[in-house]
Amino acid sequence: MKFAIVANTERKEAVLLAKELTGWLDSKRVSYVLESLSAEKLGIGPSAKIDDLNRICDIFISLGGDGTLLLASHYSETKPVLGINVGHLGFLTEFNKDEMIGAVEKVLDGSYSIHNRTQLEATTMCNGREQRMCALNDVVIEKGTYPRIPTFVIRLDGELLGSYRADGIIIATSTGSTAYSMSAGGPIIAPKSSVFVITPICPHMLTVRPIVISDDKVIEVSVDAQAGEFPLNCDGRITRMLQPQETVTVKKSNDLINLVANEERDYCEILRTKLLWGREHASSQPE
């Protein structure tokens, strides 16, 4: 088995963990390859470009936050991703730094399980050709630098859902419901729910609300504006700039993201801790 290691080298703790992990793997004579930028900053090898890791490795290890895991999952395709959280509590990264070695040992002896997560697939036409992009968390169309409030036209399975004057539209998976969508007022959805949520960003009308739909729906979004370019983001990566009236088609991808599961992880506890639910009540309890 060969591991691909992707680390957020902007975080000192991730750097220390990467050195600890590679030292441990060396001591066990386990093969690994670091993503080239991580390897350069760490001064550790062997390394390869991130888009080559899927071809030469069996499983990815992400050292960082949810953003680092999203990056790793984008290149892992269907290969498992083991997420080690550094810093703030993550919704996607399943293990903390103290659990890292134990988690890797479980992978090596085959005693691990997988959480399958649904992805979005966004399709546009570019120079007469289809361009397809995938996202684990969300697909976002934003107003960008357009000086006015554009109108976003949304259709479900070809039927008009509505026209929203807003700063943007977020289409999120249940996994991504705790990311940008939540910040924009969208609901929190349990990770394995077979739904998507469409969340407007700063809508101009108070009656406009997020809507939860079945994940078998095909969503079409276009921007009704006279001019301008509108960023299309997949998991925070700007994939291209959309022209007025251009349509983006979003649906469930056929490919799943496979995350190495932490069976001791309590999702409800994560919500309470991350979102400070019940903190006032907890702090009032006698010691």
From Swiss-Prot:
Can you tell which superkingdom this protein's organism belongs to? Bacteria
Any keyword Lyase? no
Q: Name one GO biological process term.
A: NADP biosynthetic process
Q: Which reaction does it catalyse?
A: NAD(+) + ATP = ADP + NADP(+) + H(+)
Q: Does the entry feature the keyword Transferase, yes or no?
A: yes
Active-site residues (renumbered):
D66
Q: Name one GO molecular function term.
A: ATP binding
**Location in or out of the cell:** Cytoplasm
**Cysteines engaged in disulfide bonds, as pairs:** none
Chain's role: Involved in the regulation of the intracellular balance of NAD and NADP, and is a key enzyme in the biosynthesis of NADP. Catalyzes specifically the phosphorylation on 2'-hydroxyl of the adenosine moiety of NAD to yield NADP.
This chain's protein is named NAD kinase
Organism per entry: Chlorobium limicola (strain DSM 245 / NBRC 103803 / 6330)
Gene encoding this chain?
nadK
